[in-house]
Design a protein with these regions (language model features):
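Acidic helix N-cap motif at the loop->helix transition within catalytic regions
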Residues: 9-13, 36-45
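A conserved acidic beta->alpha catalytic loop
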Residues: 31-40, 87
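Acceptor/aglycone-binding surface of glycosyltransferases and processive sugar-polymer synthases
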Residues: 51, 55-74, 79, 91-172, ...
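Catalytic donor-sugar/metal-binding loop of nucleotide-sugar-dependent glycosyltransferases
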Residues: 143, 166-170, 179-196
Length: 230
């Protein structure tokens, strides 16, 4: 699943590389009515393995993925892979997620582990990512090394857990919330190394508002965890 908003410079390359990387995967582009024509370009690439889901407006990362989960679940898919549309996640590494899928409900593509690599990212973004994961790990009592990674695989069973949960995040905090749900339902989680490359075209969707939402929600979950442990 590839959520998009104004990614016309990147989406064709991501789709073509994904199709070349694995014959096992189908591709779903979830477009939030991109004004730059991303959705129309994705439509032109539709075939038996490539699909496009159009949403009426920009609603955030979380709602876009939920729409994609619903689409895939209704069609009987067993595994769901999240991937950014900007080329930062390498389609050629999807095999690492797929290989780890048997016996696991959540496979986290991790930048900050042996074998992982981050290229062309400014120090500010590195610090935000590392601090965010560290803070969330302490607040939630988790030991994973990249809670905010957007390159991950989810099982159908975890998707069912997500559907029955009261999700409260819209932005990148959604990725932390998914790990929280998986842990709460005692789902089996594993990490695999990935290469992350800073986008070369288009604009990042990261904003101060998104960072604040993730921080506020993580802090709230941390307080709730402390209260429930008493």
């Amino acid at each position: 699943m590839v959520p998009t908003y104004n990614e016309i410079a990147n989406i064709s390359d991501v789709i073509l590389r994904l199709k070349s990387a694995s014959a096992e995967v189908d591709i779903l582009v979830v477009d939030d009515n991109s004004p730059d024509g991303t959705g129309a370009l994705a439509d032109s690439l539709v075939d038996s393995r490539t699909h496009v889901l159009h949403r009426s407006e920009k609603g955030g990362l979380g709602p876009a993925y939920l729409a994609g989960f619903t689409w895939g679940y209704d069609r009987g898919y067993e595994y769901f892979v999240e991937m950014d549309a900007d080329g930062s996640h390498q389609p050629e590494e999807i095999f690492r997620l797929l290989a780890a899928a048997p016996g696991h409900d959540l496979v986290l593509g991790t930048r900050w582990m042996p074998g992982g690599l981050v290229l062309n990212w400014p120090i500010s973004r590195r610090l935000i990512s590392r601090f965010g994961t560290r803070y969330a790990s302490l607040a939630l009592g988790l030991s994973f090394r990249d809670l905010t990674s957007g390159y991950r695989l989810l099982s159908r069973q975890l998707i069912e857990d997500i559907f029955t949960s009261q999700l409260t995040t819209i932005g990148y905090g959604f990725q932390i919330e998914i790990v929280r749900i998986a842990n709460a339902h005692k789902r089996i989680i594993v990490e695999v190394p990935i290469t992350f490359v800073e986008r070369v075209a288009g604009n990042s969707k990261m904003s101060g508002k998104i960072v604040v939402e993730a921080w506020r929600k993580t802090t709230l979950w941390g307080f709730q965890r402390m209260v429930y442990r008493r």
